[in-house]
């Protein structure tokens, strides 16, 4: 997840987006212009790839893509009425608003990438191969850390001339090395 995106970056993106893309409904353009004109609202706006799990979301589409032109939802209530969405955004300006934009080449747009955030409500899904790689990395890191700790304790046993501790730690180290193979 990237660092916080500034209000100015979000406003610049909205202006760029509206200049570059024609919305399927003019009300979508009005809502985006309203948002861009109010820093206190922009502060709570998050551009995401999907609205799954979000408590309050706005899905807008530009011409050239096959998506609903305008959807707003809050909790379990969903509407295609821009007036209701505008009213909620205006009155509840201090609530998080997740915005999903559908437009041509959205995923390859550097402007969109700059403001896009991970949806905090969507679980990260890893393929089995990725899970195995992550597990192997964790195991290797833990093993390396443990081995270094035992080596440090062996050095301390040598420094204090503690022969019993030294032999015990060498056996532990040998056992760790055999288990790794």
UniProtKB/Swiss-Prot annotation:
InterPro entries assigned to the protein according to its UniProt record, in alphabetical order: IDEAL_dom, UPF0302, UPF0302_N, UPF0302_N_sf, Virus_scaffolding_prot_C
SMART domains: IDEAL
Pfam families attached to this UniProt entry: IDEAL, UPF0302
Family: Belongs to the UPF0302 family.
The protein, known as: UPF0302 protein Lm4b_01938
């Amino acid at each position: 997840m990237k660092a916080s995106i500034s209000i100015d970056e979000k406003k610049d993106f909205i202006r760029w987006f509206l200049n570059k893309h024609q919305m399927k409904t003019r009300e979508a353009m009005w809502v985006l212009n309203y948002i861009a004109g109010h820093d206190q609202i922009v502060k709570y706006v998050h551009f995401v790839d999907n609205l799954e799990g979000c408590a309050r979301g706005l899905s807008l589409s530009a011409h050239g893509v096959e998506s609903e032109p305008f959807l707003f939802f809050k909790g379990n209530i969903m509407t295609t009425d821009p007036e209701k969405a505008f009213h909620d955004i205006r009155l509840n300006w201090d609530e998080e608003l997740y915005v999903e934009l559908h437009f041509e080449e959205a995923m390859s747009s550097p402007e969109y990438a700059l403001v896009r955030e991970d949806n905090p409500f969507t679980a990260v899904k890893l393929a089995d191969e990725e899970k195995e790689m992550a597990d192997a990395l964790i195991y290797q890191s833990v093993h390396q850390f443990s081995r270094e700790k035992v080596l440090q304790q062996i050095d301390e046993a040598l420094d204090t001339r503690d022969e019993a501790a030294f032999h015990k730690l060498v056996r532990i180290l040998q056992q760790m090395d055999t288990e790794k193979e």
